Amino acid sequence: MGFTDKQEALVNSSWESFKQNPGNSVLFYTIILEKAPAAKGMFSFLKDSAGVQDSPKLQSHAEKVFGMVRDSAAQLRATGGVVLGDATLGAIHIQKGVVDPHFAVVKEALLKTIKEVSGDKWSEELNTAWEVAYDALATAIKKAMV
């Protein structure tokens, strides 16, 4: 079974909720660093700070990550696959030292953040929609990391 219209709608609505509160970006990176403190140096906007502090770069990067997952949901529904819009993503991830376990950390942080953002609208179906879209995006990025 392919990615459904309903799954795409679930991702889109929670994406809109995510964007409405800048604190969601801070939460996302806080969860990442709780799971993988060494990842701090991979993010230019975090490496010289004492902790996760809100900044325009942090907001921009978080919105980019969540937005790419949202775009992946749209691609999955439309075509059944994900093609990266930015051909440099693989090289950037290699340059930053990203390895396979990092994708699992980001996935966990993304899903926990979406659960928090969604509040009483959260469901297993919503979680699965984000999970499937993220996994497809992560697979596309990993393929580009050559």
Swiss-Prot record:
* Ligand binding (O2): H61
Post-translational note:
Nitrated in effective nodules and particularly in hypoxic conditions; this mechanism may play a protective role in the symbiosis by buffering toxic peroxynitrite NO(2)(-). Nitration level decrease during nodule senescence. Phosphorylation at Ser-44 disrupts the molecular environment of its porphyrin ring oxygen binding pocket, thus leading to a reduced oxygen consumption and to the delivery of oxygen O(2) to symbiosomes.
Biological process terms from the Gene Ontology for this record are: nodulation
UniProt: heme b binding residues:
S44, K64, H93, K96
Q: Where in the cell is it found?
A: Cytoplasm, Cytosol; Nucleus
Q: What tissues has this protein been observed in?
A: Root nodules.
Q: Does the keyword DNA repair apply?
A: no
Claim: Heme is one of the keywords in the record: yes
Matching SUPFAM superfamilies: Globin-like (SSF46458)
Q: What positions are modified (Phosphoserine)?
A: S44
What are the residue boundaries of the Globin domain, all occurrences included? 2-146
For this chain, one GO molecular function annotation is: oxygen carrier activity
Q: Which residues carry this modification: Nitrated tyrosine?
A: Y29, Y134
User: Which PROSITE patterns does the UniProt record give?
Assistant: GLOBIN, PLANT_GLOBIN
Keywords, A to Z?
A: Cytoplasm, Heme, Iron, Metal-binding, Nitration, Nitrogen fixation, Nodulation, Nucleus, Oxygen transport, Phosphoprotein, Transport
The Gene Ontology CC terms held by the record are:
cytosol; nucleus
What does the function comment of this entry state?
A: Leghemoglobin that reversibly binds oxygen O(2) through a pentacoordinated heme iron. In root nodules, facilitates the diffusion of oxygen to the bacteroids while preventing the bacterial nitrogenase from being inactivated by buffering dioxygen, nitric oxide and carbon monoxide, and promoting the formation of reactive oxygen species (ROS, e.g. H(2)O(2)). This role is essential for symbiotic nitrogen fixation (SNF).
State the family it belongs to. Belongs to the plant globin family.
Subunit details: Monomer.
Could you tell me what this protein is called? Leghemoglobin-3
Give the organism the record lists: Medicago sativa (Alfalfa)
